[in-house]
Amino acid sequence: FNSIRIDGSEESLTAVRNILTKENDFVRYANANGHRDYSPERNKITFSNVLCPPSEIWEEYFMPSGFSNDPEIAKMYNNTDTNWYEWNSEHWGTKWDACESRIEGDPAEGSLTIYFETAWSPVSTEFLDAFAEILNIANVTSAVYHYEEEQGWGGEMGWDKDLDQQYFRQIDEWDIPDSHADYELRGLDCVCTYMDDFKYDDCPNVESAGE
């Protein structure tokens, strides 16, 4: 689970939203050649609008990855840095484009929040650096990136124009919760609330766990 809250003027937020949701040449190439539909609907994003695979590798990018069921194809393309799996993992930090993405909020009210899912990891520093350039150009005020893996570990990174930041900086990070207190501290329901056979030592009524 990922979210990026962006604060700024109506003009700056509208500019960022338009950049994230536009149909670019990479998307048009993908669609024209019968590949996965990369066209984002309104208020949906594609990572390629922030950090796009260079046009000279597009043909190789969309060829089968090393995970092909054909052994010869797998051998041919495995461990190359130009197929979609390797390029995305290296540059975006995750193997897929933004999943289940949406943008909520009204630029006129001074804030937008971008929601999206990634495969097992947050987006890369390289991706965030490219996104920070967009924020600078659009003259956005600030942004906070929140990421959390389904097991519970995660973190937050921030960018603030008033601090003359060029890049996102780490604000907070946390490990997988390992106690009832950890869950409460983060405002989450402990696993003991939905798993009768699992309790931490500090869970309420832990004495009754084995009865």
Regions found by a protein language model. Give the residues of each.
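Intrinsic low-complexity, intrinsically disordered or marginally ordered coil/linker segments
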Residues: F1-E211
